[in-house]
């Protein structure tokens, strides 16, 4: 079974309409920045350089994760930090921005776009994570689409 948008298991009802805030949040143009921490923050020590990325940076990253592969959030954060010459990537904005990417992609799926044509957020959001539980796609949909991408 293909985990298409209409076959979501426990997915929440979607209102992919013009009123959805996610495409607008995705479209906001902001620059990434690297800041120096003047106190410990979210497990990152004072004096460390911290990347505050953007939704687009996360969307670009997830688009590069190959079909059938997944990445843990920690790996995503570490790779983005290295790429932007920082010690770490902000864990708080990582969750916020990955949710924006996921919900904007979900709106596209709901409007008929093929999974192959959206940012494949399911490859970096673990179905058992707290973030997954907030998504309209639902945790079962994430499990189903991940399973569908695995070789048989």
Regions found by a protein language model. Give the residues of each.
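Polybasic, lysine-enriched low-complexity intrinsically disordered terminal tails
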Residues: 1-27
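Nucleic acid-binding interface residues in structured DNA/RNA-binding domains
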Residues: 16-21, 29-33, 37-152
């Amino acid at each position: 079974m293909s985990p298409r948008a209409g076959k979501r298991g426990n997915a929440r009802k979607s209102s992919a309409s013009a009123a959805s805030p996610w495409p607008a949040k995705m479209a906001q143009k902001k620059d990434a920045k690297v800041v120096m921490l003047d106190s410990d923050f979210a497990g990152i020590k004072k004096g460390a350089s911290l990347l505050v990325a953007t939704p687009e940076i996360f969307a670009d990253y997830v688009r590069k994760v190959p079909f059938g592969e997944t990445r843990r959030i920690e790996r995503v954060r570490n790779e983005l930090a290295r790429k932007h010459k920082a010690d770490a990537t902000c864990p708080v904005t990582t969750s916020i921005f990955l949710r924006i990417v996921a919900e904007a992609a979900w709106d596209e799926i709901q409007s008929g776009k093929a999974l192959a044509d959206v940012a494949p957020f399911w490859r970096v959001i673990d179905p058992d994570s707290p973030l997954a539980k907030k998504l309209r796609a639902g945790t079962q949909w994430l499990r189903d689409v991940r399973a569908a991408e695995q070789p048989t």
